[in-house]
Amino acid sequence: RRVLFRSALYRKLTAQLGVKPEDVLHIGDNAKIDVEAAKKAGLHALLLPRPADVFMDVDCTQMANLGHGCLAGFTTADAMQPLALRCAQGLAANRFFDDGYAPATADSAFAAYPSRLGYYAVGTHLLALAKWLLCRCRADGVKRLVFLARDGALLRQAVELLRTDADAVETDYIPASRRCLLPALMANPTDWAALPVRWAVYTPEKTLKLLSFCTLDAPESELRHQAEAAGFPWQSPFQEKTRWESFLRFFRDKLYDGCRHQAAYSAARAYYEEKLPEGAACFDMGYSGRLQAALCQLTQRAVPVYYVHADGRNSERLSAAYDFPVHCFYPMPPAMSGAFREFLLSSDEAPCVGFERQNARVVPVYAQEGRNEAAHFLSTCVQHHALQFVRDFHDTFAGTGVMQSLDSPGVQLAMSLPFEGALRQLPEADAELLRSIPFEDMVFAGEDALDLRTLVRDQSAEAALAAHEMGAADAPSRMIGFIPEQTGLVKRTIGFLLFDRETFRKKLRKRMHRSPK
């Protein structure tokens, strides 16, 4: 190896072959010996990196370092140590890095491939969430777990893949959205001021469309005339919150139909009473507890809920008010939440906007809206590969200690580090995946689509600023690396002492055993 690095062997080789160095192309997997030394001898040289080198960020990609930036307060070595996470990295490396020419760049984690984002980052988190749910249901004695649309579609499939004979829980999937639960969310007049909407993007027209379930059955022209006569331009957004609140008071006094509201409430109640029987629990992404409080109000039962995380204040207040237990995967809200998390994990099916009675049965009514093909392709590809990771992990490690270790809450959280790293520190090259992807929230955004790429960038900047203001330096996404094969003897010794003392002791014992003097 030393002779190779000094280029002498390359010169001797070309001399014996009787060829000019510039006519030789040397290909190898070591950047210094196979490329730098060969070039010093005048040869052309190309690097064909080993799959493990590509995955572990040796000149190629940030993929293996995802999650490092979420580790404020403890060391990378401790957090990334669980065997299950290292096995997950092995699966990802085997799947995507068996070709040295696979596109990978130092400023990217996934080379803007949704398959890589889904398989590694989303897949590890999906596996951890599914194992957490199964463990919680087993411990809590839950026999029926209902996944609320659209957040629970993918996770339900993962739970079904991992469920064993020891897991007696049955699963179901039902629609639940702020839009279809508005009759319950607005059951009390005091709740009207706390509607989960972004009032600044609403107009009187959009507001009446949102509240159509309890608006007087009158022609739109008549509703418009009354609104404008009261000083509310039909298509002008509310400039101040006081104007929004004034319009709600006007609506309550002039345009509200209590009978239609009660009919919508009764239909929703009949549907959820059937779908959420005694002993059932729900899964929802989170966060405030409003939807769960509405479900408890409709069913007249305290229905437990499992969240990825809660927002703290509102969820605690509503949990106490409606007496429903809240169990969270994360003990505290993570730095990045909301739109991007839901986009990666939720189904892109049409949202439920209400319920209607058909032949003595209550059935959900879905929005009639066009589908964004770019968003559909991205979410479908990401979720397909995430579920494939869960399937591969189960097929490879079922019945082993690796799978059993996932019952530990600490290992479950560690498995989610790549996902949190992707949310919080998505490299710019990979953020191009989100270009032209709208995030649509019919209630919050008033049917206006939020730009997902901009939203993620803004949330990431806010998270970094919050960490800075709290006095915690945001850890970089690329940590200090130590590659013994590419380091001199003195630096290698120092590196082992700093980063891997156990390996240093083993090497020292081996060296002394070979040469005791």
Segments from the language model and where they lie:
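Short glycine-rich phosphate-binding loop at a beta-alpha junction
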Residues: 142-149, 280-283
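Long, contiguous domain-sized segments
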Residues: 99-105, 110-126, 184-186, 190-193, ...
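Conserved beta-strand -> loop -> alpha-helix junction used to position metal-binding or nucleic-acid-contacting
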Residues: 167-184
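Acidic, divalent-metal-coordinating active-site segment for phosphoryl/phosphodiester hydrolysis
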Residues: 30-45, 292
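Conserved Lys-Pro-Asp/Glu-containing loop-to-beta segment of HAD-superfamily phosphomonoesterases
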Residues: 8-34, 280
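Flexible inter-domain linker/hinge segments
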Residues: 51-129
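Conserved phosphoryl-transfer catalytic core
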Residues: 55-74, 193-215
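Short, small-residue-biased leader/transition segments that mark boundaries at the very start
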Residues: 3-4
